Amino acid sequence: MKQYIFFLALIVLVSTFAEAGKKTEILDKVKKVFSKGIAGVADLNNMSELGCPFIEKWCEDHCESKKQVGKCENFDCSCVKLGGK
């Protein structure tokens, strides 16, 4: 009976270490995905610097129709009302 308890405890101990190893693998995968996400945001920011001149004209026209002034930042068109009543 003591042998069964010993082997059961040994199996539990080994499975605990095996699970601990899997957690580090999962953590590495999460870190890898997170770093890819950060790289994607950096790429998008770099593209916005190139794409903004094309979008700038559209933004100016769009805001001009609202009688406002437009500015493009990171593919985001912001309309600002000048002067005001």
From Swiss-Prot:
UniProt-listed InterPro entries: Long_scorpion_toxin_alpha/beta
- Keywords from the named record: Disulfide bond, Ion channel impairing toxin, Neurotoxin, Potassium channel impairing toxin, Secreted, Signal, Toxin, Voltage-gated potassium channel impairing toxin
Which is one GO molecular function term here? potassium channel regulator activity
Domain named BetaSPN-type CS-alpha/beta is located at 49-85
One term under GO cellular component: extracellular region
- Main localization of the protein described in the UniProt heading: secreted
Keyword Amino-acid biosynthesis on entry? no
Is Signal among this UniProt entry's keywords?
A: yes
Signal sequence region: 1-20
Residue ranges annotated as propeptide are 21-37
**Places the protein is found:** Secreted
Q: What is the recorded name of this protein?
A: Neurotoxin beta-KTx 17
Source organism per entry reads Lychas mucronatus
What taxonomic classification does the UniProt entry list for its organism? Answer: Eukaryota, Metazoa, Ecdysozoa, Arthropoda, Chelicerata
